[in-house]
Structure formats: C-alpha cells, structure tokens
Amino acid sequence: MTRVCSVWLSLLLVACGAADPGASDGATDPPASDAGAEDAGPPPRTTAPTLPEPTGACPETFANGRVTVSPEGIAPREVQVWIGDAAAEQDGPLIFYWHGTGSRPEEAEYGLGPDTMEAILAAGGMVVAPIRDPEAGDFPWYLTAGTGDDDLRVADEVVACAMETVGIDPMRIHSIGMSAGGLHTTQMGYRRSSYIASVVAYSGGLYLPRLPPIEDPANRFSALMFHGGESDVVIIGFEDATERYHADLTARGHVAFICDHGSGHTIPTAARASVWAFFQAHPFGAESPWSEGLPADFYAPCGLTP
C-alpha cells in the first residue's frame, strides 16, 4: 500500500507543477515513529567512519569546475567542485550540497554563503554539488520521490576518489541541501551514516509513514534542521516533516537542533555562519559539545526542541 500511495503522490506532485515534493520510501524500509522505543538503549558510539572504495576510474584530480566520477553500475556523472590551493597542503572537510528542484549546483554558493565557502577552502576542504541525472525524473534526486541509490553512489565515488587523489579529512564529511536537496540530505544522513559526520537540512525532513534504513545506527550524527513555519508548504508541509525528522533522531539518541526561521520556503541567509559553526563542532563520531544548549551567538531561532 505504501508503494501505491507513493506512486499516486508522485503523480499528484507532477500534475500540480510542484517545485519540491517530499521524499518517498520503498516498502522495504523500516517502520517509522518510535524507532528506538523498544531498544534497551543506543549502541556504543562509532568513532571512526567506514569509507567507500573507488568502484570506477577516478579523475586525475579534483579542481574547480566540473569533474566526472564513474561509479560502478551507473553512467558517469558530473559534479561541480569548489576547491582552493590550501587543499594541496592539508586535508580539509568535504561538504556535499544538494540543490532544490529547478535550481542549479551553483545554489551552493548561496546556501553556504561566501564567507563559509571561503572558510571551507582555506581549511583545505572542498564543496561538491552533484549534477542531477535527468533519468531521476521531475525532481533532481532519486531519493526525493523514489528509492534509487544512484546519487548516493555518486557521493560514495566522490568520497573514495577524493581520499585517493587530493585528500580529505575522513572525520569531516558533511551534507547540506535545500528543499528537494534537504529531503535528499535527510535520506543521506540515514543511508550513509557509515561516513557522514553531520547534516544540515533547509526545508527537508520526513513525511511518509516509513523511515529510510539507517546504515550505521552506532553513528549518532548530529543534525541541524530548518523550516519556515506554517507557510513552508510546497505540496507537503515542511514544518511537520522537519518536526518528525527531529523527533526520530532524538528518539535514536542523536543530538538534533531545530530552527523555525518563519520565512516560508526559503534559505535563511542569516543562519549561514551558524551552519559553518555547526559543521566545525560536529565531526564524525564525536559527542555534540552543544548537547545542553547552543552557543549564545548561534542563530537565534534554533534550539534543542521545536
């Protein structure tokens, strides 16, 4: 029945010309709601990521502009890369950015902001915004309204090849996205918890009765999630989807922060400095230093509870 409802909803979204739907889960995904309620407690925390290995030919290097990766089992895909000279001297963070429907990879520059982009590159890191596969359909990412793992395979190949060529900090692999990209980032946190350190979702979350599978339950990654209040609605209500996402992670023992910026379906640009501070404070496997509350200078609408 879940699969039938998902197909019907996808058709409805197309008919309505929506900019972004919610994410759809397959019938094999585990049931939602009280995910950890029957457990004796969370497992011991994972302290080291499990990194993917290259499955195809890696690019010679990662440089500014478009780079092609070749994951096994799917056609080669391009990604947009931002990287600086500092990457030759130090292994910095890798930030994946997933744009919204109708947008472009360059949205990363707006979603992160110029100061954060500069800081990431100065730390020897890079930002990678995958290019959508037209075969994904009306929405940019397979997990926005389906169950295909193609985009996750692209991310895996980027991680593996970046480690092999330019070098990255394996403890600082993060994901961020807006709308369809926020929904994808939500999925990626669960489905690639073997290496994702922490995530930020602008108008993302969970909206169907079933949850995505979690790859490594022992990686209790932290999440920073935003919604724009009651008016943050594009077919689905992102306020409700975000609150459900927050409830599930906290039930699993994760530290999750939720922010109502009150400006509808938009990226809260005033929060961008706090997004970078959040990523810096939450490497892989670490206890959140903010588990009792956020710093005084953090973006004001954010907190531990809705």
What are these regions (language model features)?
Residues 1-8:
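Bacterial N-terminal signal peptides that target proteins for export
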Residues 17-20:
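Bacterial signal peptide processing site
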Residues 23, 32, 36-94, 125, ...:
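A domain-start/cap signature at the N-terminus of enzymes
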Residues 59, 73-83, 87-170:
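Serine-hydrolase catalytic machinery in alpha/beta-hydrolase-like enzymes
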Residues 167-179:
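Alpha/beta-hydrolase fold nucleophile elbow
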Residues 197-276:
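The feature captures the conserved acid-bearing segment of alpha/beta-hydrolase catalytic domains
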